[in-house]
């Protein structure tokens, strides 16, 4: 089986960079942190929602981010929880006057 990556240490960041380039109007790096995956524009009139987790075999948490869904996802390494810095930067990128709800499992 072939691996489709350059370097395992850079796998998550390179994957995220590819997603940002492929869908620039749907996703962006919050607070200049590539691991703070957010939907552009702060939600108005609702509580912001942040989720996240390890990257795993598929970027499952990224699929929860979008209009009418979660406002951001903090991304960790493969099978590793996101860092507190990634969670904080995701929070800062999506926070508004209505607060932030966290959905981590």
Question: Predicted segment positions?
Answer:
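Fold-independent oxyanion-binding glycine-rich loops
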Residues: 23, 52-54, 72-73, 104-105
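Glycine-rich oxoanion-binding loops at beta->alpha junctions
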Residues: 57, 64-98
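Conserved active-site and cofactor/substrate-binding residues in soluble primary-metabolism enzymes
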Residues: 6-14, 44, 56, 60, ...
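Glycine-rich, flexible N-terminal cofactor/catalytic loop recognition
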Residues: 35-67
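N-terminal amphipathic/basic leader segments beginning at the initiator methionine
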Residues: 1-48
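Acidic beta-strand-to-loop metal/phosphate-binding motif
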Residues: 97-105
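Aromatic-enriched hydrophobic runs in primary sequence
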Residues: 11-13, 20, 51, 59-64, ...
């Amino acid at each position: 089986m072939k691996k489709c990556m350059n370097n395992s240490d850079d796998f998550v960041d390179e994957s995220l960079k590819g997603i940002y380039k492929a869908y620039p109007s749907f996703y962006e790096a919050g607070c200049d942190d590539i691991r703070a995956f957010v939907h552009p524009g702060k939600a108005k009139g609702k509580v912001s929602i942040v989720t996240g987790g390890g990257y795993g075999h598929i970027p499952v948490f990224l699929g929860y981010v979008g209009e009418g869904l979660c406002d951001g996802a903090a991304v960790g390494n493969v099978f590793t929880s996101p860092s507190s810095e990634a969670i904080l930067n995701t929070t800062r990128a999506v926070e508004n006057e209505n607060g932030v709800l966290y959905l981590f499992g």
